[in-house]
């Protein structure tokens, strides 16, 4: 079965560490170093979840979780959070401890292999005047017959120009970066495209690459199931967007390893959002 890949999780292309010896022969083994990788998205008014892994230059599949570190998260208003380890590299705040609003700056600090790892980010403004051209979209169900190697992952994050569509708009006078995430909130939703036995869609949560527009058109092939969908407009910081090739953005095409985290790699960034709902109905 095709490996499932979650949208916008950063798989980092890692380089080799420094070499201490003064003279190197061709037959000397060179052992690359590992580094800590931070994955932290601070959503305004939400609890905190930060994931830590230890990278390996031998490939992303060999990265391992980093457990039981002491992590401090402090806001510019003076509030401090101590995150606790919950397993699989994830550190969480208490459910009652939430990120503050726009303009609040956060500093993350931890110690890894004797070095202080530090990162700073600011929560951006919430999107304003988010509107949709319709609260519903009617899509005919499609029965896909036979074998087709293109069945897996049907639909796309960028959308096509055929079939029903709806438009989103918002204020963006300063050309800030936005992305839209599409999430079905229904329980056991019915598929729009019925696939042959043994085939599975590899991604039921869609996300549009970051852009600086004040509008977006969503097409029927960007929805995989019927039911109520949350259309989440994300306001993104430029430090996150800069990690990607914006002309062909995916979770796998970082041009260079991130360098905004002192003594570490990864992403630590503030996010703000607004949400609309749309019902996807069968024709």
Tell me the role of every PLM-derived stretch.
Residues 22-283:
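A sequence/structural signal for flexible, mid-protein segments enriched
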